[in-house]
C-alpha cells in the first residue's frame, strides 16, 4: 500500500466505521459523531467543490499511477485524510492522557502532510489542490463541532449499545 492510499475512502470509511462503533460502545457518542460526521461532510463538500470548479488535472509526461477520472480541485485524498486525522486528534485530546494525545497529533500531522505530498509527487494534483483540501477539511471538522450542540440526542449521556 502506498502512502497516498491513507487518504482513500477504501481505507478511511471502514477505519472510521470501526472507530465510531468503538466510541459508541464506550459511550462516547459526541466523539463518534465528530469523526464520522467530519468525514462524511468532507466527502460531500469535496465533490461539490470539484463540480463547481471543474479544474483539470495537471498535464504530465510520465504517470506514476493511473490518472484519476474526476476533477483536480480540491484533492479528495488529502481532504479526507485531513478530516479523519484532525477529528481523531481532537478526540484523542478528549479521551487520552495529554502525552498520548500529543503523539496522536504529531503522527496525524505527519500522515496528512505525506498524503498531500504524495498527491503532488504522483502528479495528480497541483499544490493549491492539496492545500485547498486541507483547508476544506478543517472547515468541515469545525462545522461539525459547531453543529453538535444542536443535536439534542448527543446531550444524553448514555451508552447506545
Region locations from a protein language model:
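Hydrophobic alpha-helical bundle signature of multipass membrane enzymes
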Residues: 1-71, 87-94, 98, 102-107
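Membrane-embedded catalytic cores of phosphoryl/pyrophosphoryl-handling enzymes
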Residues: 61-161
Amino acid at each position: 500500500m502506498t502512502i497516498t492510499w491513507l487518504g482513500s475512502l477504501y481505507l478511511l470509511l471502514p477505519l472510521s466505521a470501526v472507530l465510531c462503533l468503538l466510541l459508541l460502545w464506550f459511550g462516547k457518542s459526541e466523539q463518534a459523531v465528530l469523526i464520522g460526521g467530519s468525514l462524511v461532510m468532507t466527502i460531500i463538500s469535496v465533490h461539490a467543490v470539484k463540480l463547481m470548479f471543474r479544474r483539470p488535472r495537471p498535464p504530465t509526461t510520465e504517470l506514476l499511477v493511473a490518472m484519476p477520472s474526476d476533477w483536480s480541485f480540491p484533492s479528495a485524498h488529502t481532504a479526507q485524510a485531513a478530516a479523519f486525522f484532525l477529528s481523531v486528534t481532537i478526540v484523542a485530546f478528549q479521551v487520552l492522557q495529554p502525552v498520548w494525545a500529543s503523539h496522536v497529533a504529531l503522527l496525524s500531522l505527519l500522515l496528512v502532510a505525506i498524503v498531500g505530498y504524495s498527491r503532488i509527487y504522483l502528479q495528480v494534483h497541483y499544490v493549491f489542490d492539496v492545500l485547498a483540501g486541507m483547508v476544506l477539511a478543517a472547515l468541515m471538522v469545525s462545522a461539525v463541532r459547531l453543529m453538535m450542540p444542536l443535536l439534542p440526542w448527543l446531550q444524553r449521556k448514555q451508552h447506545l449499545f
